[in-house]
């Protein structure tokens, strides 16, 4: 599911017009608008639209969400929005949520690679190893300030 800048109204319309639930199932989703809260409501303080929550419930077991954003932090940014990330991870789990602007190790890029085979989506085996390796490397480094723009 490629969401682009999809907001909750679009998802509501899709949910209302789609009569075959099989067409709504997904296992890999790009978090719309860089993980802003607009997928759920107009304002981050608003309750989420039920259609957006229902759409998340259409995810297959083991589904992934990828945000084309910097790492989501607990702050007032929107996008990316911590509250939106929490909505996604409540459904798919924290380990299946990724940001393309993730931590770098020794200034190396951090690509996110999936294998799609026979209708199944899985994190690429080398990517799993790299993720574990990066996490260990980041944990072992001295804390340094990070600047985001």
Protein language model features and the residues they cover:
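C-terminal regulatory/interaction regions
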Residues: 45-47, 63-64, 68-149
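Active-site-proximal loop/helix segments of hydrolase catalytic cores
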Residues: 1-61, 65-68, 75-76
């Amino acid at each position: 599911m490629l969401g682009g800048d999809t907001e909750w109204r679009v998802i509501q319309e899709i949910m209302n017009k789609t009569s075959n639930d099989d067409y709504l199932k997904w296992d890999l989703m790009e978090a719309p608008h860089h993980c802003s809260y607009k997928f759920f409501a107009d304002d981050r303080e608003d309750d989420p639209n039920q259609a957006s929550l229902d759409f998340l419930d259409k995810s297959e077991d083991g589904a992934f969400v990828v945000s084309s954003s910097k790492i989501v932090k607990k702050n007032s940014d929107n996008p990316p929005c911590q509250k939106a990330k929490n909505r996604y991870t409540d459904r798919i789990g924290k380990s299946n949520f990724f940001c393309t602007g993730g931590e770098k190790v020794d200034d190396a890029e951090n690509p996110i690679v999936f294998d799609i085979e026979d209708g199944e989506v899985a994190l690429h085996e080398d990517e799993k190893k790299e993720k574990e390796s990066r996490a260990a490397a980041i944990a072992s480094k001295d804390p340094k300030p990070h600047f985001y723009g």
